[in-house]
Amino acid sequence: MDKQSSAGGVKRSVPCDSNEANEMMPETSSGYSDPQPAPKKLKTSESSTILVVRYRRNFKRTSPEELVNDHARKNRINPLQMEEEEFMEIMVEIPAK
């Protein structure tokens, strides 16, 4: 079989699996279907969206005496190490028409 070039310029001696002769190609539309009308544009006031975003952090301060891990002391962690719990809530409201 002749060598074929791929997109990367590397010569291949066998065709790709997707080029098998028994593979069926999906049929495309012939273009004779009725065209769909373009969606009607709404006024800005009717299509407004309200986003409410809430973000909260809880900080737990750890004093140097509470740091028991020697590895943490070797890495010079800030004496007031902060552990934070975070969450984000996003709510989308679409006004009724």
From Swiss-Prot:
Compartments where located: Cytoplasm; Nucleus
Keyword annotations from UniProtKB, A to Z: Cytoplasm, Nucleus
Region: Disordered, residue numbers: 1-46
Tissues and organs where the protein is expressed, per its UniProt entry: Detected in testis, sperm and a melanoma cell line.
Top-rank taxon: Eukaryota
Cross-referenced InterPro entries: SPAN-X_fam
Subcellular location, principal: cytoplasm
Position of sequence motif Nuclear localization signal: 37-45
Ranges in coiled-coil conformation: none
Protein's UniProt name: Sperm protein associated with the nucleus on the X chromosome D
